Amino acid sequence: VLTFCNYFRHVNSGGTYVVEDLHCSYLPRWGGGIDRGDTSMEFLKLLADVVNQPYWQREREPLALLAPFFPGGARPDLTSFRDIVSVTFYDSMCVVEKRAQGAVDGLGERVVVGTEASVSTDPLAHRSTRQS
């Protein structure tokens, strides 16, 4: 976890950071276990939430989400975390992709069309006024 925090900021824009041997996160002899919340695998799962931060950030601060991994009040620099564009898992491996320079954050401009919102009216606030 600390290695990721120290080195991800040095990954070039559009580059990838690979974490291997994640099976150790599940093996008790290596300090792991499926129910342990402090493993590298659990930290990387939280990075998937960081990618989707625009949808939950009003409810919780990103540092609060990651706090269990930084005891004693240590605070990671979250600046480079904003550049995470994807977190992909493979057998015993995770690939974290850094946003390319100049790439649009998230999915791009939100476009909502239509005038009815039968479940929630919230999306109508984002209704596009441009013509297609």
Task: Annotate each language-model stretch with its function.
Residues 1-132:
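C-terminal substrate-binding/active-site "lid" region of AdoMet-derived donor-dependent transferases
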